[in-house]
């Protein structure tokens, strides 16, 4: 997982990720995005247990699941631009849980990650 402190609460985000320029690297393919008001890894990992040897269940307590993104690009230096993601409530911390990588490895590599605060305008 990857945790980002935005420094202040935001109501909507979008992000841009760039894969590394190395062909053998494993990028994120499927991720769950969670948000929280505070950074508390002990709460996040509350209830960790081994299942089937290597698989780990994580409770994600204290966070709110916002979305699941699938089919992220797997090419060398390939760029992904997310849509605007409205958050369920203003939040300061983003938790990117990588559930699948492009090469099926238990680790991932990113070249760059940019996160943008967005404003939502409702037209009447």
Locations of regions flagged by a protein language model:
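Extracellular carbohydrate recognition and processing domains
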Residues: 46-86
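Aromatic, loop-rich ligand-recognition surfaces of beta-strand-rich domains
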Residues: 1-47, 79-123
């Amino acid at each position: 997982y990857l945790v980002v402190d935005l420094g202040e609460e935001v109501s909507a985000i979008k992000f841009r990720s760039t894969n590394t320029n190395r062909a053998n690297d494993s990028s994120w393919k499927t991720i769950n995005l969670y948000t929280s008001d505070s950074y508390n890894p002990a709460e996040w990992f509350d209830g960790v247990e081994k299942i089937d040897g290597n698989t780990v269940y994580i409770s994600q307590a204290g966070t709110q699941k916002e979305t699941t993104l699938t089919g992220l690009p797997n090419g060398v230096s390939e760029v992904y631009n997310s849509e605007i993601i409205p958050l369920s409530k203003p939040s300061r911390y983003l938790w990117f849980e990588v559930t699948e990588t492009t090469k099926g490895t238990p680790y991932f590599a990113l070249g760059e990650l940019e996160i943008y605060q967005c404003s939502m305008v409702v037209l009447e």
